[in-house]
Amino acid sequence: MTLPVTAFVAAICALLLLITAIDTVRQRLRVQAAFGDHGDAKLISASRSHGNLAEYAPITIILLGLLETARANHMALMIVGAIFLIGRVAHIAGLYAKIEPGKAPVPRQIGVVATFGTLLALGGWTLWMLATVNL
């Protein structure tokens, strides 16, 4: 396969999207909500876990693919991809955790830091590759 790191991360994201989509549908059926969330905490958690992954996965996969195509170090790319995936799983778990008023659950915090760190690393790395390799 030409882009194995990108393919691996994309495949895991696809599975996570499917899992979160199925749970969102289950929650919608439970509260009989075709549209909106009806203020139901479980439906909100399910739909946001799916939506949040759908928001961050595409740019991460694109950046991984660009870097892999530019022959960036595969081991480093796999580590960054793994951090992203671990962060996404943590974020999903955090959205389902019991909420203390005014404080995000620790898994959600880990997920946010991992996701933002991944985007910063991949974005910076891509710009660095553009500035140094393609001159």
Where are these regions (language model features)?
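N-terminal signal-anchor transmembrane alpha helix
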Residues: 3-33
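Membrane-embedded alpha-helical transmembrane segments of multi-pass integral membrane proteins
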Residues: 13-16, 20, 64, 83, ...
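Cytosolic, membrane-interface loops and tails of multi-pass inner-membrane proteins
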Residues: 22-47, 98
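Juxtamembrane helix-capping/reentrant segments at transmembrane boundaries
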Residues: 37-51, 103-112
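Core segments of transmembrane alpha-helices
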Residues: 52-64, 119-120
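Short alpha-helical packing/oligomerization segments
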Residues: 65-87
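Interfacial loop-to-transmembrane junctions
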Residues: 92-118
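Juxtamembrane boundary at the C-terminal end of a transmembrane helix
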Residues: 123-135
